[in-house]
């Protein structure tokens, strides 16, 4: 499997199961997808044809019930419908990594479904160790633009950006809210 960043704003998500796992998976899509619908067991059609029809109306299917056999049935129907599907109890055709978003910075960590707690731990360790990641992204973007006007060599520009990235003083300034790209650039050019 590979990581992709996907625009889901036009996609509809159907989640079977409204427990903790279903709620967590719904939260993953809630702010981005066109629609997120969660069904509890009592609201799920028992007739296979009706279930097939319901699944065909959605783009992404999540089987998040505590019943492995039911989840298998849902993912089989989703597969027959050529849908993206994920299961809480088996392998789907996509995974939901542990994610962090802030500004233009996004981080996704996965253990391919084998140890989700490890993925969450790594995500939390990185984001707590570097609280100014989003600010560094903003600074690097600004510096790239400024450097293109001052330094013709792409190799030299890349070296300067790496020096800034590895400068503990710059990270500290970013954490304190000081983002003066021109002043930082003067240190390196």
Label each PLM-derived region with a short phrase.
Residues 40-56, 64:
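Glycine-rich, highly charged phosphate/nucleotide-binding loops
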Residues 94-104:
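Glycine-rich, charge-decorated loop segments at or immediately adjacent to ligand/cofactor-binding or catalytic sites
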Residues 58-68, 105-114, 126-128:
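Short beta-strand and adjoining strand-loop segment in the mid-core
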Residues 60-65, 71-96:
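ADP-ribose/adenylate-binding Rossmann-like module
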Residues 10, 56-57:
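Alpha-helix C-terminal capping/helix-to-coil transition sites in glycosyltransferase folds
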Residues 113-189:
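An accessory alpha-helical subdomain
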Residues 1-45:
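Hydrophobic, well-ordered beta-alpha structural blocks that scaffold small-molecule cofactor pockets
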